[in-house]
Amino acid sequence: MLTDIEISRQATPQPISDIAKKFGIKKDELSQFGDAKAKVKISILDRVKDNVEGKLVIVTAVTPTPFGEGKTVTSIGLTQGLNAIGRKTCACIRQPSMGPVFGIKGGAAGGGYSQVIPMEEMNLHLTGDIHAVSSAHNLAAAAVDARLFHESRLSADEYTLQSGSAPLNIDPEQILWRRVVDHNERSLRNITVGLGDINGPVHASGFDITAASELMAILALSHDLKDMRKRIGRLVLALDKHAQPITAEMIGVAGAMTVIMSNAIEPTLMQTLTGDPCLIHAGPFANIAHGNSSIIADRIALKFADFVVTEGGFGSDMGFEKFCNIKVRESGKAPDAAVLVVTLKALKANSGLESKQDINLPDQARLEAGFLNLKWHMDNVSQYGVPVVVALNRFPSDTQEELEWLKREVMLAGAFGCEISDAFSLGANGAEALAHKVVEATEQDSDFRLLYSSDASIEAKLLTIAESGYGARGVVLSDEAKAQLEQIKAMGLDNLAVCIAKTPLSISHDPLLKGVPQGFELPIAQLKINAGAGFITALVGKVMTMPGLGVKPGYLNIDINEQDEIVGLA
């Protein structure tokens, strides 16, 4: 079979204005970036405000494995399949970060015959939104350090005279705003800035990957430009010497940050291999951020489509949980159905059983042990009151006997439906059965419910997610986290949602605990204030907000060939 990039390159994309027209978007509501992609102006929402909204379907998965479960393939394939059976459908997915593209995971455009094209344009830069987030974020870091520098060299009266504003008395030991870059760079996790006689007070800092920036979360959770401006103003950048918050508004940088991101608030329209519309917007990771595409993209798509297919990153304990407890809490739009993606390989890998046998070969013992992980994720999704359709993403090595066994077990375990998906190899034709079942699921009465109330304390929210969301028997806060919790309460921010940052490789905090871990306590290392985004991030265990490159990174395969074409993107 051809590689993803070869399949993408063989296709001839339709003019993006034609894709928009079929979907109901007018030409003057687009800002085109060449023939294959365009920004959709947010003002379009005024024109379609009275349109009836379509159905929202969220795609999630079992605990991820190195083999890939095919969540984005399934999201794009389902979009193709729904359109093929006459249901007007749009996909809404995140913009890929270049960190994973050049690292180990690769791109995020789908794959095979269910992908967004041109895939190299999607995976590299797109329309520049991530760069805008990086620039706005780093402007705030520069503004804080500039303020600190000038306040440290001038008396309070002289500073007020020269600047026209009173000193903020920033505590250099309490600068909370780090820097970001859209690459995996472990050496920048912890740095010291201000070295040298004329470069300002020395203090600790560091870099996170741009996908972990609070600005990325703000981009994904804002309703419009005015809302984004308010949220950016609420960013807590540092504390003063009395432990009071210093915001982007107080520094005076919020307006400029918003201007840098003013075009980024518009989602980018692209297409699948079969000409189906796809809105790509925002790119927060699901392990270290909230892991979902934007509310704005969903709002636009829902006003034009019968069905909107979106996805949450990693397993249902990660992106799906945050979709429900963070994104839905902000948007007010609950999902009508959930699709849970699984593969035979994933079940065997999640079995927790040691085996020297090739994972592609039949192995009933590992399959049965790994099924417990799938059952856990089914129950996890069901507790939110959403009908669950399991999608068995078929690999060429899968046996019909194992697939049929798994279908039977899934239905006995209480799923609304279970269908084999051949979207990767067949595109729309391989996802029509799944599409029909999803339509049936959305016709059921939905009883969506959040996991916790906004009025609950931070401790109660953490405990609820740990126990109900991960199966833990409790939480343990480090001394640092306890002190930060008191700070959060003193600032009156304990009404915010909670975003857990943890490993995606286990339902627990320990990536080595496979299957369905039990009896563990969730260790909370730090609590970070994200007042602009509207949540508190709890860093669990040894999770890192800046990834590192592995011994065999993806960039080794990427180059330009003799025809000046990009090769090696996965």
UniProtKB/Swiss-Prot annotation:
Family as reported in the entry's similarity comment: Belongs to the formate--tetrahydrofolate ligase family.
GO MF entries: ATP binding; formate-tetrahydrofolate ligase activity
Enzyme class: ligase
Keyword Kinase: no
HAMAP family: FTHFS
Protein name according to UniProt: Formate--tetrahydrofolate ligase
EC number: 6.3.4.3
Annotated catalysed reactions: (6S)-5,6,7,8-tetrahydrofolate + formate + ATP = (6R)-10-formyltetrahydrofolate + ADP + phosphate
Pathway: One-carbon metabolism; tetrahydrofolate interconversion
Keyword Ligase: yes
Disulfide bonds: none
Residues that span the membrane, as ranges: none
Protein's organism: Shewanella woodyi (strain ATCC 51908 / MS32)
A GO BP annotation: tetrahydrofolate interconversion
Sites where the protein binds ATP: 65-72
Keywords noted in UniProt: ATP-binding, Ligase, Nucleotide-binding, One-carbon metabolism
